[in-house]
A protein has these predicted regions:
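Extended alpha-helical targeting/anchoring segments
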Residues: 1-400
Length: 400
């Protein structure tokens, strides 16, 4: 447990103690700090005029020092085992020999585990459970109306309001995660256990990624339900692309991503490499863009995180005022929801996703949460229905 006045400064200080090479067959990861960053860490970014309400039930940040790890290559069905060798203390030869012994031990463990363990059977289909929201639909729609009034008054262009659904039934988090992999596969699948707290999810969206000094943001904004047939799905994509509200919302968040990166990028290096493309997910279709930039030489990985946190797609724009309005209108601090999950590597890489499509399991209360972007012409009922669509893939996994 680390106590410090600035969590982002702590990350810099800690990471500076270690350096490791990169091995492409492992992807970008080669050991580092891995965990979650709660939304309420925005209080420490320096962006806000005053602190927002902060979750007191769960840590603001949980990071694990990962120096032994296993990589699985899906394409070639191959496992790689890695361990870090520390050369700052004692004999390098001795450290190397200990590392080899460690690798052999892990190899034996993997072989024994694969030969003696099978995944539990999970039915192919299940009915979603009723969602126990902490606010009623009418209460949420009233908050949407209040946000619209503030937007009409010029306070903001967009505000992302979320709803929380409690998990009141006993659920095995690991079985939930396995089912989630089946029904809602996403670019980022994660299962993290820290004491009696488990955070697991299937996030579709990068928060920020850094590799070879290139930072990437990938705004996802604009949503429509999946069609039941290929023809209907194609039609839904056309409807989404023709929806002026969804296009305006998406463009606003692409501009916000460009602005976030411009603060930490070399002049002229910010580029939109993909713009407003419809992408299929298990239950919805999203509009997706890709924004990249070359980092300024003086920028550290925690600087990148600090200046992009939290993501504009979970706040709205302008970001600071949207965060203040969210704090005013939502009934409880967001906590883990809408922060990010991922790693900061010893090889100067970082890969994080936004903590959405995520379940939090803990004795203090287990929940799901999702949001919708509110703009001047939002229809409150439609925004509520969007949240229900986003949570559907999670809720069908809950009976497990």
């Amino acid at each position: 447990k680390i106590l410090c006045s600035d969590p982002f400064d702590f990350i810099d200080t800690y990471i500076a103690r270690y350096r490791s090479p990169s091995f492409k067959r492992f992807g970008s990861y080669n050991g580092g700090l891995s965990g979650y960053f709660a939304y309420d860490l925005v209080n420490y970014t320096g962006h806000l005029r005053q602190f927002i309400h902060q979750d007191t039930l769960h840590p603001l940040m949980v990071l694990h020092h990962i120096d032994d790890f296993i990589c699985y290559d899906n394409k070639y069905n191959t496992y790689y085992i890695a361990t870090c060798i520390y050369t700052h203390d004692g004999s390098i030869e001795s450290a190397y020999n200990q590392a080899i012994q460690c690798l052999h031990t892990y190899e034996d463990t993997i072989i024994n585990t694969l030969s003696s363990t099978s995944l539990p059977y999970l039915p192919a289909y299940s009915e979603s459970i009723d969602l126990d929201f902490t606010s009623s639909p009418d209460e949420f729609m009233e908050k949407v109306s209040q946000a619209k009034t503030l937007i009409e008054d010029g306070e903001a262009l967009q505000v992302v309001l979320s709803m929380r659904a409690l998990i009141n039934e006993p659920v095995d988090p690991y079985r939930f995660y396995l089912k989630l992999r089946q029904v809602n596969p996403s670019p980022y699948m994660f299962y993290m256990k820290h004491g009696d707290l488990t955070v697991t999810g299937s996030s579709p969206e990068i928060h920020v990624k850094v590799q070879d000094t290139i930072a990437t943001l990938r705004p996802i904004a604009g949503t429509i339900a999946q069609g039941k047939t290929k023809i209907q799905n194609k039609k839904n994509k056309e409807i989404l692309l023709a929806n002026e509200k969804e296009r305006a919302e998406h463009l606003m968040l692409v501009d916000l991503a460009r602005n976030d990166l411009s603060i930490i990028a070399k002049p002229g290096s910010v580029q939109v490499t993909q713009f407003m493309q419809p992408e299929d997910y298990s239950h919805v279709i999203h509009l997706v863009s890709n924004v990249t930039a070359t980092l300024n030489d003086r920028i550290s990985l925690s600087d990148v995180l600090r200046h992009t946190f939290p993501a504009g797609t979970v706040t709205g724009a302008p970001k600071v005022r949207a965060i203040e309005i969210i704090d005013q209108l939502e009934p409880h601090p967001r906590g883990i929801y809408a922060g990010c999950v991922g790693y900061i590597g010893f090889n100067n890489t970082m890969d994080t996703c936004i903590t959405i499509r995520t379940a939090v399991f803990s004795p203090q209360g287990s929940f799901l949460q999702a949001g919708a972007g509110i703009v001047y012409d939002s229809i409150p009922e439609n925004e509520f229905n969007e949240i229900v669509h986003k949570l559907k893939a999670l809720s069908v996994s809950l009976p497990f």
